[in-house]
């Protein structure tokens, strides 16, 4: 054995409370007290191991120093992969560090340039939950969890895959928790506290397995830490500070029955730290060959307040070596090298000691295969503790399952090789970043410098900071980084997780109500029918550019046809009638229209009075009693306008639908919020215009022109309808004035006075006799062969004019508007004739013709979207751009909710439940909207999440429904298709998803065999 105390490892005389050696053995970290802050220092291991390297001035001893902790650092621990370093301190924080390969060294802050950081380490996540000093941190054996304990009497389990998510908070100690340790396979975690107890917790459900108190009855809270340790074979757990016959010991606790019959004795004062060697050894004979009946044993180091260190072998009754007065103060921490032959010890006196053993002294270490067999004999092969490596060695019973597994492994190898190439190209100083050399990047930055001339002609150049370029070694472990105010934080994924996905921009407003709801919606402007146009802002916010609504424009009576597409007259919307996306008119726009004399002041009128210029009168039953309570808003327009091109600021903006309110008007000029009265609903009626033009679509080019009150022979006035499609024009005349128009690539329809609705083909042929509406028209829409009419009485009808069938028959909006001050802000008619109403409160309802019910398909205030997290279940980035009616309705609201949820800790169980509920809502909404590609997308995401989380019952139910009966039965109610998709084809798409998890290979085999039987039939 060799003993060394490197004097250059110090914290400038301050205490060192923790030490840990990197898994690759090239460096080690120390944590302790700094100058007015906590200090974490990363040191080079080579000068400790080799005397020549220590003397070589070209070999740096200190690699990096971090002073980010606000108070003393009590513990530093490397992850088992060596990628991350966790540190906990008296500032109640746990910081997770990761190396960042910058170009060139930097100096330590406050060192006047004397100390240089050879390596750059940055804090990638700050974990905040403890209310007291953090005493110890520990990574689980497979880096899936990070545990921390504190003087607040709690142990917190963090999800190391998704920092800062908290999986569990273990409460049970009544004193300061000062030590943590995991068992070798991560099945248990043990904690020791000042309440004279040691508790063992199960990781399966995070519940208490056992509490051991007898060996600690005589103990007092005299130690700064209580670092206990679990043996690498899993058989023994050794505690810190215990007492036996009033003498300090390290208590040995057997896993079998948690018996406490043995202990390590000999120290004169309380034991502060126990650390097992990571290797399991077997005895070595003198001739160099291992003994045949060799029994494996472990090695353990014990440190005490008596400043001495003892090293024990479990095959010996006495310690292998004892070193007295190794330090001037208490031993605080111990760390073994990964090969098991070296040990670092730190003390409160601010010094470090290194002990180097030989194999002759400790024995021959067992191989990893032999170590794994010992673990299996101790813990078994429970799926609850099986790692990915163990699953990969499991027996695969199906050759198709093997094919999917090999394909998945090949994808992982391709990703790793790509990441390796990126890291290799970033190591050289003259490397390339994104296809551009670093020198070129610096030159391009210099080109952007700002140069000005002073009054006397001298040049003045504004200094430009050229930051050091961070070129590596960032792996795909990070999904996203969300900056926190005043701190550095980020979310982290393991290197085995799904490929990195680009987060959607949550700042983009929702095309279907994602922006702030208008609290004061206005009625339709007289210059155009309500709800028939879309402004540029709403088009930019729409997630699918192929689904926009037509544009209505107000023009002089004699407008030239092609000028309808000029930017001076229209908003150049690339509209198709498939899915209108409307926005509300703001009060500012209303005031601007009033200033241009395009809109007169609003005035109340009797509810039961017919619309202006209508020849039909409604009988007045109780006019005297109702006239004071029921009001109607009428908007009139000034027909005397200047000839020629309208002013730029006088263009009309899209207007939202609003529902009539029974409340009395307090001021005529005040914009009113119209709500649904208890007795009746009243929607605004478009006023007749002299002329207007409607752009139906841009591809193919199609627009409609309407001209009212065209004088013919004999003084008779008619209305003219013109349609131009790709240069081919047709026109027809009607006897009544046209109030509003709509069109699609299949039909053109107009609503006239006297409640008449006329439908024409795109060639001008009348398809139906005029339809008499139950009340005056309010809004008209067309999609394909479907025509939707929303009347002033808030009744909705949808017809399929080609098949001449009714889809929705005079359905009232009372059920979705009654009882509150809500307004209809936007309307959508899907390609399958499903009407969707988006309300001002952010909720969207669609009418289900099969059930004759209004179904909720979207809610902007949905809390499920804020907690749901299914990033790992998304197949690719392209899948996130799934378009359709559901995507238009919801926009990007759900993504912003998930981004916001990352800033707050959500328990894993709660997040699991909310994610399942959210995905099931998405599948049901896509089914209700009859959107086949969205239904397929969300079904695959839902199934992938079930596979990842291990929900076999729900997954099996989905497979059973998609498979159907194998043998045909006349009484079977099973439908072979869903929203136009074949169920069994969907099941074939699910099989590769199921095949990614070996736990479901039985389900995979069952489904595949039954599909083969059906195929043979």
From Swiss-Prot:
Expressed at high levels in kidney, pancreas and skeletal muscle and at lower levels in brain, heart, liver, lung, and placenta. Residues 604-619 have a biased composition (Basic and acidic residues). It is found in: Nucleus; Nucleus, PML body. Coiled coil: none annotated. Residues 494-509 have a biased composition (Low complexity). Residues 494-555, 570-589, 604-625 are annotated as: Disordered. WD repeats lie at residues 11-53, 68-107, 129-168, 172-211, 220-263, 266-322, 326-367. SMART domains: WD40 (SM00320). The modification Phosphothreonine is found at residues 555, 576, 586. Residues 594-739, 740-828 are annotated as: Interaction with PAX3. The modification Phosphoserine is found at residues 111, 549, 557, 584, 610-612, 614, 661, 675, 687. Changing residue 555 to A: Impairs phosphorylation by CDK2. Keywords: Chromatin regulator, Nucleus, Phosphoprotein, Repeat, Repressor, Transcription, Transcription regulation, Ubl conjugation, WD repeat. Residues 536-555 have a biased composition (Polar residues). Changing residue 464 to D: Impairs binding to ASF1A. Residues 593-826 are annotated as: Interaction with histone H2B. Residues 439-475 are annotated as: Required for repression of histone gene transcription. Residues 421-729 are annotated as: Interaction with CCNA1. Signal peptide: none annotated. Belongs to the WD repeat HIR1 family. Interacts with histone H3-3B, PAX3 and PAX7. Interacts with histone H3.Y. Interacts with CCNA1, HIRIP3, NFU1/HIRIP5 and histone H2B. Part of a complex which includes ASF1A, CABIN1, histone H3.3, histone H4 and UBN1. This is Protein HIRA.
């Amino acid at each position: 054995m060799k003993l060394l105390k490197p004097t250059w490892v110090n914290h400038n005389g301050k205490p060192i409370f923790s030490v840990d050696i990197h898994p690759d053995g090239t460096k080690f970290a120390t944590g302790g007290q700094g100058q007015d802050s906590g200090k974490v220092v990363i040191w080079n291991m080579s000068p400790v191991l080799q005397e020549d390297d220590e003397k070589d001035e070209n070999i740096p001893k200190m690699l990096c120093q971090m002073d980010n902790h606000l108070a003393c650092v009590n513990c530093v621990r490397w992850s088992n992969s060596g990628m991350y370093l966790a540190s906990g301190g008296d500032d109640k924080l746990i910081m997770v560090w990761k190396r960042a390969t910058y170009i060139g060294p930097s100096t330590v802050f406050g060192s006047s340039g004397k100390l240089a950081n050879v390596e750059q380490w940055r804090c990638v996540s700050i974990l905040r939950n403890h209310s007291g000093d953090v005493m110890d941190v520990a990574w689980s054996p497979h880096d899936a969890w990070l545990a921390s304990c504190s003087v607040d009497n709690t142990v917190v389990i963090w999800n190391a895959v998704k920092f800062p998510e908290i999986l569990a908070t273990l409460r049970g100690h009544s004193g300061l928790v000062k030590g943590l340790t995991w068992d070798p396979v991560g099945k248990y975690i043990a904690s020791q506290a000042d309440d004279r107890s040691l508790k063992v917790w199960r990781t399966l459900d995070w519940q208490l397995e056992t509490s051991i108190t007898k060996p600690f009855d005589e103990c007092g809270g005299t130690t700064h830490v209580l670092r206990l340790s679990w043996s690498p074979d899993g058989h023994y757990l050794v505690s810190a500070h215990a007492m036996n016959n009033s003498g300090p010991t390290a208590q040995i606790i057997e896993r079998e029955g948690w018996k406490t019959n043995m202990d390590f004795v000999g120290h004169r004062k309380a034991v502060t730290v126990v650390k097992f060697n990571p290797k399991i050894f077997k005895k070595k004979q003198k001739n160099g060959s291992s003994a045949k009946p060799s029994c494996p044993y472990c090695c353990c180091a014990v440190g005490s307040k008596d400043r001495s260190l003892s090293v024990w072998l479990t095959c010996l009754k006495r310690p292998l070596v004892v070193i007295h007065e190794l330090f001037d103060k208490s031993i605080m921490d111990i760390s073994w090298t990964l090969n098991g032959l070296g040990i670092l010890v730190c003390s409160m006196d601010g010094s470090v000691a290194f002990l180097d053993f030989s194999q002759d002294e400790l024995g021959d270490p067992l191989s990893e295969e032999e170590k794994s067999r010992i673990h299996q004999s101790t813990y078994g092969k429970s799926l609850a503790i099986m790692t990915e490596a163990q699953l990969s060695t499991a027996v695969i019973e199906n050759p198709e399952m093997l094919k999917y597994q090999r394909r998945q492994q090949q994808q992982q190898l391709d990703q790793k090789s790509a990441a390796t190439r990126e890291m290799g190209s970033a190591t050289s100083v003259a490397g390339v970043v994104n296809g551009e050399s670093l020198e070129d990047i610096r030159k391009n930055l210099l080109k952007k410098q700002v140069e000005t001339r002073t009054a006397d002609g001298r040049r003045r150049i504004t200094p430009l900071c050229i930051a050091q370029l961070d070129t590596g070694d960032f792996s795909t472990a990070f999904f996203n980084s969300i900056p926190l105010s005043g701190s550095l934080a980020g979310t982290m994924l393991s290197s085995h997780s799904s490929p990195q996905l680009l987060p959607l921009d949550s700042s983009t407003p929702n095309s279907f109500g994602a922006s702030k709801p208008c609290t004061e919606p206005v009625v339709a402007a007289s210059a155009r029918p309500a709800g028939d146009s879309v402004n540029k802002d709403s088009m930019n916010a729409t997630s699918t550019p192929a689904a926009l609504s037509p544009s209505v424009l107000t023009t002089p009576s004699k407008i030239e046809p092609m000028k309808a597409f000029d930017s001076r007259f229209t908003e150049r919307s690339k509209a198709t009638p498939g899915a209108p996306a409307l926005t509300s008119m703001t009060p500012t726009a209303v005031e601007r229209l009033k200033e241009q004399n395009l809109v007169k002041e609003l005035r109340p009128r009797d509810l039961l009075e017919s619309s202006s210029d209508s020849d039909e009168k409604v009988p007045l039953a109780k006019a005297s009693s109702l006239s004071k309570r029921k009001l109607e808003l009428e908007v009139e327009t000034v027909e005397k306008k200047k000839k020629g091109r309208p002013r730029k600021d006088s263009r009309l903006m899209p207007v939202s639908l609003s529902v009539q309110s029974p409340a009395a008007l307090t001021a005529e000029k005040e914009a009113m919020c119209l709500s649904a009265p208890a007795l009746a609903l009243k929607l605004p009626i478009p006023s007749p215009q002299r002329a207007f033009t409607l752009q139906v679509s841009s591809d193919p080019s199609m627009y409609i022109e309407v001209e009212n009150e065209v004088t013919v022979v004999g003084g008779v006035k008619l209305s003219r309808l013109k349609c131009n499609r790709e240069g081919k024009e047709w026109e027809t005349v009607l006897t009544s004035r046209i109030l509003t128009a709509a069109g699609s690539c299949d039909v053109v329809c107009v609503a006239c006075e006297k409640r008449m609705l006329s439908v024409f083909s795109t060639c001008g042929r009348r398809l139906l006799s005029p339809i008499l509406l139950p009340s005056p028209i309010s809004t008209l829409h067309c999609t394909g062969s479907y025509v939707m009419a929303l009347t002033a009485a808030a009744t909705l009808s949808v017809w399929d004019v080609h098949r001449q069938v009714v889809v929705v028959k005079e359905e009232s909006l009372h059920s979705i508007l009654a009882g509150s001050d809500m307004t209809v802000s936007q309307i959508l008619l899907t390609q399958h004739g499903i009407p969707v109403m988006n309300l001002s409160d952010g909720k969207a309802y669609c009418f289900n013709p099969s059930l004759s019910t209004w179904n909720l398909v979207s809610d902007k205030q949905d809390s499920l979207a804020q907690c749901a997290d299914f990033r790992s279940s998304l197949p690719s980035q392209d899948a996130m751009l799934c378009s359709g009616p559901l995507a238009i309705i919801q926009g990007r609201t759900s993504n912003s909710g998930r981004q916001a949820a990352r800033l707050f800790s959500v328990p894993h169980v709660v997040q699991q439940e909310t994610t399942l509920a959210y995905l099931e809502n998405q599948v049901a909404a896509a089914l209700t909207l009859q959107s086949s590609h969205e239904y397929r997308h969300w079904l695959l995401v839902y199934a992938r999440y079930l596979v990842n989380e291990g929900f076999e019952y729900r997954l099996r139910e989905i497979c059973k429904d998609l498979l159907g009966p194998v043998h045909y039965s006349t009484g079977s109610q099973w439908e072979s298709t869903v929203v136009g998709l074949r169920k069994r084809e969907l099941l074939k798409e699910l099989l590769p998803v199921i095949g990614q998890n070996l736990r479901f290979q039985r389900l995979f085999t069952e489904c595949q065999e039954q599909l083969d039987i059906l195929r043979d039939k």
